[in-house]
Amino acid sequence: HKGAAGIVYCRSRKRVEDVAAALQAEGIPALAYHAGMPSDQRDAIQDRFIAEDGLVMCATIAFGMGVDKPDIRFVCHHDLPGSIESYYQEIGRAGRDGDPAEALLLYGTDDIKLRRELIETSEKAPEQKRIEHQRLNQLLALVETPDCRRQALLAYFGERLGEPCGNCDRCLTPVERQDGSVAAQKFLSAMVRT
């Protein structure tokens, strides 16, 4: 997406600053935006992003509400989003002009572990922790689905897409499925015998 407008969402202010600096070091015109900045500075950065072509906005979730820039070609989540609802809203900022756009979500097992630890060590009530774990599990089920991502996303919101979309990574490069039942039976049989 060289020369295209995009948004990179990060969960922390420090990560926003680090990612923007890394992109700038690679010659990519990137801006940083987070709630720790004075409001006049945030307004100026947002206005610049809307007015200029080809800028990449590195931001926390503080950015995006009320942003009307139709030619955003990509939205990248540098960290796991807070929820499926947040993810849906944030990726919806790309391609509003009707031209092709992409969404990319970067995460690893350490991100999942950290999120679970943050939930467990929070001072929230046990029921709220259970709900947050459930929301994280739903998000992980979506991002790890071997099936059409658009179908999975719409199904979460109670909508149906009759056919796979044909555009997501799962449709364009299907996951190779393997029947593991024979291997599982052999494993269980070996366990019973030992």
Can you name each region flagged by the protein language model?
Residues 1-124, 131-134, 161, 169:
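Helicase motor core with emphasis on the C-terminal RecA-like subdomain
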Residues 31, 115, 121-194:
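C-terminal accessory/connector segments of nucleic-acid motor ATPases
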